[in-house]
Amino acid sequence: ERITPQPLVVQLKLYFERKPDNFGRTLAESLDYGFVCGDVAFLLEAAQFQLLETAVEAICATLLMTPPPDRPSIRPDAVEVSIQKPQALGGKAIPVVTVLRHAKEMQYGIEHNDFGHVDILHENQDCGVYLLHIPAGGQIPAHIHKVMGEAELVMSRGLLLQGQPVDGGIAHLWPLEFVHQYDNPTDTTRTILCVNRPKFDPADEIAVPVPETWPDPRPHRKRFFGLETNLKP
């Protein structure tokens, strides 16, 4: 089962400490469950986890992160993630892994770099999960990876990919040595949820000249949220 992808059943429980009549009236004071569903689906597809245990830990860490500035919401006080693998034992039994994590117990790393900074959400033997912050007017310059697999989920509208607008909720699962560049022409920080396999290695972030013609990213594109959601402009 570590070689062939199998269907999973995921159950999420989000916990909030709230007083009566104090639940918020806008999405910035609540949580958009379309975003939650999209983030989780992206992680499970992009990270190619070999163990249910690492999958649930990565999901917990991502759902409990400080909300991105370009996708404001409240932060859950705790999350419980259960993942079932119905086909793992040929129907004799259904393996289930459940983890409960509280926001107050989470510890996240941060890395400052040339384009902005990165929140290190989770790292394990399979992969790393990161939130890339591109400041207003900033850029992730043209680069490739020769070793790391990489997938990136754009969290809001406003970024340019290869000089063209890319919508929030759109992910790209990049082939090795595929040149890509992001620009942020907006007046606010924009973020990208990034998965590297294995975890990020700065030696494999290889800067390259801007090509005369950008390679087309569309064959590597998939939407995870956005069509049913009011994205922040």
Specify the residue positions occupied by each region the protein language model found.
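Conserved hydrophobic/aromatic beta-strand scaffold that supports enzyme active sites
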Residues: V96, V129-H133, A151, A171-L173
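A short hydrophobic beta-strand segment most commonly corresponding to one strand
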Residues: A151, D187-V208
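Regulatory nucleotide-sensing modules
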Residues: H122, G128, P135-H143
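Glycine- and acidic-residue-biased ligand/ion/polar-headgroup-sensing regions
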Residues: A136, H145-Q162
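N-terminal, polar/charged subdomain of small-to-medium soluble alpha/beta proteins
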Residues: E1-G116, H122, C127-V129, R197-D201, ...
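Short acidic-glycine-tyrosine-enriched beta hairpin
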Residues: L160-H180
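Asparagine-centered strand-capping/turn motif at beta-strand->loop junctions
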Residues: H180-D187
